[in-house]
From Swiss-Prot:
Keywords: Cell membrane, Membrane, Transmembrane, Transmembrane helix, Transport. The chain crosses the membrane at residues 19-39, 63-83, 106-126, 140-160, 173-195, 200-222, 265-285, 288-308, 324-344, 348-368, 388-408, 410-430. InterPro entries: MATE_fam, MdtK-like, YsiQ. GO terms for molecular function: antiporter activity; xenobiotic transmembrane transporter activity. This is Uncharacterized transporter YisQ. It is a multi-pass membrane protein. One of its GO terms (cellular component) is plasma membrane. It is found in: Cell membrane. NCBIfam families: matE. Belongs to the multi antimicrobial extrusion (MATE) (TC 2.A.66.1) family. It comes from Bacillus subtilis (strain 168). The gene is yisQ. CDD domains: MATE_like_8.
């Protein structure tokens, strides 16, 4: 992408800082990519230690991923509400929301972290973990999960910085955390510099230490950039009206994510019925095609910040046009990258496996992304735009109806009952994404969201 492409999208001073979609989006793209990498780095590096440790950490990460979704709802509300207040030049109120979001996410995440620490074993038993894997999984979940409130605070500070347009700062912190995490993993897995080989426990400590340092960096940067002083009195003073606004945006957003994750767990169960090869094919295919989603995710987050400001400044036409332009770019990029991946699909899958059956099936699934990913772009872009406008409930209702009323039934019908296998599952994904995408598009075109602004 070239910066010139996005010049016409520049936000014209609804606050002190002027920025374009491009200036917001490229750091977010790198940050999201690195967060995905950091989530997989522990597993990848532990594969050099033992297969059991990989399995144990993999199961623990499934629980941790659900916890992250629970933390994200405050961060989502923070981005929207602060952006709206800045757009309407209510800087004092924007600062108050920042304090409320830090305090609220601290209390919520601390409580969840405590539950995870003390209930680690029952939670792992619920996942069907074998006794052989329990010791490693317990250690990892208790250390990383017990300190997961640190990640919640990082997400909150990151949301605050992004709302003010400082997306590069959050990117650099994420880069630093990745470097520290990988370096620490090397030390504790391979026993470098005289350190003992600590395996899973060492990796858990390495991950947590990297996050602690990342949090400290975030606090320093927020203080420097927006003069947000870490006063306990201000952080723990819960401004009821601001908290209500955060929850009004955040809770529906979390509900949508939880609904999606739960529906995907059921889809995974359907695929498990097809056998281990089908599961392996699904993992390889989604690991490859996840790259397509990263572009849409970055564009949607940058768009959300801009639209939040436009809504706060009552620039509704500008907000409408910003969403539509972002949608067109996301559709074009999704289509182009899907076609490229289809052309080189066999080479890409060959990086993971030499199985002819897996390569053939995965190639078909990647070809189907040419239809799937543009539909997903509608949802990724417009849902975040609706949230930025304060219209958070509609996407949740439509998601539940489409995922559970269309996606899952079709997954069973085509994948299991009619015997189409993974191709049938992908057909259900296409149907779900396009039905929701069209509904989101109609909602945005209706401009009902103009009535939902919160600041």
């Amino acid at each position: 992408m070239k910066q010139a492409v996005f010049k016409s999208t520049a936000l014209k001073k609804p606050a002190d800082k002027t920025f374009s979609l491009f200036s917001l989006t490229w750091p977010i793209f790198i940050e999201v990519s690195l967060y995905m990498f950091m989530g997989n780095a522990d597993t990848l590096m532990l594969s050099q230690y033992s297969d059991n440790s990989v399995a144990a950490v993999g199961v623990s990460n499934q629980i941790l991923n659900l916890i992250i979704v629970m933390f994200s709802f405050i961060a989502t509300g923070t981005t929207v509400i602060i952006s709206q207040f800045l757009g309407s030049r209510q800087k004092k109120e924007a600062m108050e929301v920042a304090y409320v979001s830090i305090g609220a996410n601290f209390f919520i995440s601390l409580a969840i972290s405590a539950v995870v620490f003390f209930a680690a074993v029952p939670l792992l038993h619920m996942m069907g973990l074998s006794d052989a894997l329990m010791p490693d999984a317990k250690v990892f979940l208790q250390v990383v999960g017990g300190l997961s409130f640190i990640q919640a605070l990082i997400m909150t500070f990151s949301a605050i910085l992004k709302s003010y347009g400082y997306t590069k700062d959050t990117m650099f912190v994420t880069i630093g955390m990745n470097i520290l995490n990988i370096a620490g993993n090397f030390v504790v897995i391979f026993g470098l510099f005289g350190f003992p080989v600590l395996g899973v426990a060492g990796v858990a400590m390495s991950t947590s230490i990297a996050r602690v340092i990342g949090l400290i960096a975030m606090i320093v940067i927020v203080n420097k950039r927006i003069q947000l002083k870490m006063s306990l009195k201000k952080v723990f003073h819960m401004h009821k009206e601001h908290l209500r606004k955060l929850l009004k945006i955040g809770i529906p957003s979390a509900g949508e994510q939880l609904s999606y994750n739960l529906s995907q767990m059921i889809v995974t169960y359907f695929i498990a019925i097809m056998g281990a090869q089908a599961l392996t094919t699904k993992v390889y295919t989604q690991n490859i095609t996840m790259f397509i989603l990263l572009f849409g995710t970055a564009i949607s987050q940058g768009t959300q910040i801009l639209i939040g400001r436009y809504i706060g400044g009552k620039q509704f036409d500008a907000a409408y046009e910003r969403c539509m332009k972002s949608l067109y770019w996301a559709l074009g990029i999704a289509a182009a990258t899907s076609v490229l991946m289809t052309i080189f699909s066999k080479d890409l899958i060959g990086l993971f496996t030499q199985s002819p059956d897996i390569i053939a099936t995965a190639s078909l699934l990647i070809a189907m992304t040419i239809i799937l990913e543009p539909g997903r772009s509608f949802n990724v872009i417009i849902i975040n735009s609706l949230r930025a406008a304060g219209d958070a409930k509609f996407p949740v209702y439509m998601a539940m109806i489409s995922m559970w009323g269309i996606g899952l039934p079709l997954a069973y019908l085509f994948g299991i009952h009619l015997g189409f296998g993974l191709a049938g599952i992908w057909i259900s994904f296409i149907a779900d994404e396009w039905v929701r995408g069209i509904l989101m598009y109609r909602r945005w075109r209706s401009r009902i969201w103009i009535q939902k602004g919160m600041a």
